[in-house]
Design a protein with these regions (language model features):
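Short beta-strand element of the alpha/beta-hydrolase
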Residues: 167-177
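Primarily recognizes the serine-hydrolase "nucleophile elbow" in alpha/beta-hydrolase
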Residues: 260-306, 310
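Bacterial Sec-dependent N-terminal signal peptides
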Residues: 1-24
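Active-site machinery of serine-nucleophile hydrolases
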Residues: 178-240
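Aromatic-rich carbohydrate-binding modules that target alpha-glucans
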Residues: 23-25, 32-75, 85-106, 140
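C-terminal catalytic histidine-bearing segment of alpha/beta-hydrolase fold enzymes
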Residues: 321, 326-378
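Gly/Ser-rich "nucleophile elbow"/oxyanion-hole loop immediately N-terminal to the catalytic nucleophile
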Residues: 225-265
Length: 378
């Protein structure tokens, strides 16, 4: 009887899991008149790391001229937009105004009918200008990542009094560098970290910020330390080795930094949040703090195994943040990581959940000053 009960329970669990994935069919029935007949169309959203040219989310054109795409998603809330392969070619309103992220609340199989009014690159706009402040400079447009045999643009923010003093400063290493300082290079809005540092740096300890650009179509791979069925080999382990063994020594040699753990931090959002959490687990003697913003733990759930195995060795400051409007798994996953770390780690931690928070750069921009002030508290 016990054996039968166990088998029945296993069967019910298997059935439940099989039904937790729903079929979602996107159908684009109307496109701008300017649309090319050979357009490659993609959906980018919170379910694929907002990759604007993800080949796994590529629409197929049918004989009637409409485009369709079928995917599987779990129960939850998702945001997305349609692109032609880049954020410069994202859908917009007919007059060129940006549109809000499309929203999907999923609890069963569904078909979504879409109409695209216009593409952003078809609108004549004033040229975008750089918003990076005078204290931001580019270290290298092609900094070598020997661990991955690739190059990357690396930028740095130096405190306003850097050239006038001989002080040494803490260093924060940030992911998705395109979005950190400059609206010109951002794909979904900038964090305005340089403006934040300029405005509140005088009220607390100032800090050097190093921003490393993401790798475009390699972003998910570089920011995930685990192999993925959908996206392929995880390269996060090598990427973090680059930060610790290549970039940090260069920064410490080239600038007046406080080199020790107490003054070395890392931060990022979404996939950048995942890799920041992994970094502090892998190198607990290097990173004294981490900003884990809206972490994409669902892409790398193995992070919880690493927390269990390595979390006890971490004694740092960790700022967990997520929004309650980021889907069904974001808040539970973030709170789980926080809770599991509290059980085994002596780290100083906080978990912030914003009721109206969405998976968006502007939300992280608003949260960054609070993270910075908390990080600099004695």
């Amino acid at each position: 009887m016990i054996k039968c009960s166990i088998l029945l329970l296993a069967f019910l669990v298997a059935v439940t899991l099989s039904y937790s994935q729903h079929s979602v069919r996107f159908v684009i029935s109307a496109l701008p008149l300017t649309n090319s007949n050979n357009s490659n169309l993609f959906v980018a959203g919170s379910f694929n790391g907002w990759n604007p040219q993800d080949k796994n989310y590529h629409f197929q054109k049918n004989e009637q001229g409409s485009y369709s795409l079928g995917i599987k998603l779990a129960d939850g809330a998702y945001e997305f937009k349609i692109t032609r392969g880049g954020w410069d070619k994202v859908e917009c309103k007919k007059g060129g105004a940006n549109i809000q992220n499309r929203f999907l609340k999923l609890s069963s199989d569904t078909t979504i009918d879409l109409m695209v009014e216009e593409w952003a690159d078809n609108i004549e706009r004033k040229p975008r200008v750089s918003t990076a402040g005078k204290n931001v400079r580019i270290i290298d447009t092609a900094f070598l990542i020997p661990q991955l045999n690739r190059t990357r643009r690396v930028s740095i923010y130096l405190p306003s009094d850097y050239s006038a003093t001989k002080k040494r400063y803490p260093v924060l290493y940030m992911q998705d560098g395109q979005n950190v300082f400059d609206d010109l290079t951002s794909f979904a809005g900038e964090w305005s970290v340089d403006e934040t540092m300029d405005s509140i740096g005088n009220h607390t300890r100032e800090m050097i910020v190093v921003a490393v650009d993401h790798g475009g179509d390699k972003r998910i791979n570089e920011y995930c330390p685990y192999d993925m069925e959908k996206y392929g080999k995880g390269e996060g382990n090598k990427y973090i080795d680059f930060l610790v063994k290549t970039l940090k020594p260069f920064i410490d040699k080239s600038y007046r930094t406080e080199k020790n753990k107490k003054n070395t931090f890392i931060a990022g959002s979404s996939m950048g949040g995942l890799i920041s959490m992994y970094a502090i687990l892998k190198y607990p003697r290097v990173f004294g703090g981490a900003g884990v913003f809206s972490p994409a733990f669902w892409i790398g759930p193995e992070i919880f195994n690493d927390i269990a195995a390595k979390g006890a060795k971490v004694n740092s400051k960790i700022y967990f943040y997520c929004g309650a409007q980021e889907g069904e798994t974001m808040q539970p996953d973030t709170e789980k990581a926080f809770s599991e770390m509290r059980k085994i780690s002596k780290s100083t931690m906080v978990c912030v959940v914003r009721a109206d928070g969405k998976h968006s750069e502007w939300v992280w921009k608003e949260e960054f000053p609070l993270f910075y002030l908390w990080l600099m508290e004695k």
